[in-house]
Amino acid sequence: MINWVVTGIGVITSILLLVIIWYFYNDHCIVLKRYALPYGTVEIVDSSCQEGLPHTWSPSIIRMTESDWISSRRDSILRHERVHLRQRLEPEAWRSFYRSEWGYELTKQPPPGIPPHWLERLRPNPDTADGPWAVWKGRYAFFPTYRDAKRSLRSTNVQVWDVLKKQIVDIPGSWKQHFCDGGNCPHQFEHPHEIAAEYITNNFNSPAAQQLAESLLVKQ
C-alpha cells in the first residue's frame, strides 16, 4: 500500500511540473523589433513578456524591453545575458566546470522528497531551463519559488532543500564562504548559471568567482 502511495505522489509531482514548465515556456511573447549583434540577435518585446525581465530564448537570442534597450543598463544587461548565450551553446563545458570546481550537479528532475507545495511554487527561468535543479555538494538543492499567490516573476525567494534531512534549511555557511565576497553574495544564487553571469558582469572577488575567472570558459 505504501509503495502505491509513493508511486502516486511521484506521478502527480511529475504531471504538476510538466504543466508548470509547459505554461511558462510556451512562447506568448510578441517581438516588436530585432537588432543584430556580432554574437546574436536582440529581440525587443513588450513588458508582458516574462514581466519585462531580460532573458535568453535560444543560443542566439536575447530578449528585453525597449526601455531596457535604451537605458544606461543596456551594456550590463547584454553582458549578463551573453553569458547565458554561452551557457546554452556549451552546456556540457559549463556543467563540467560546475561539477569539478563548484561542486554543483544540474538535473532536470527535483531531488526526491521535496513536498508538492514547494514544487507548485517553483519559479521557472528560461536561462536555467537545461537543468533547473542545482544540487550543491550532493546535499543542498537550491531553487527559486514565488513569494506569494500573485506568482510574480519579480517577487521570489530562494529555498535550500537538504536532501539528507528532507527539509528546507538556511544557506550553508560553507557555501557563503566559497561564493560570497565578504558580505556581498550573488543576488540570484539559486543556480550556478545565474551566479556565473553575475560574477562576470559585476566583477566579484569570491573564491568561486576567482575559479571562474581562471577557467577556460572565461579566457576563451
Regions found by a protein language model. Name each.
Residues 15-22:
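Hydrophobic alpha-helical membrane-insertion segments, chiefly the h-region
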Residues 45-51, 94-107:
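Acidic helix-start/capping segments at beta-turn-to-alpha-helix junctions
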Residues 48, 66-68, 83, 87:
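Short, flexible loop/turn elements at secondary-structure junctions
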Residues 82-98:
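Catalytic Zn2+-binding segment of zinc metalloproteases
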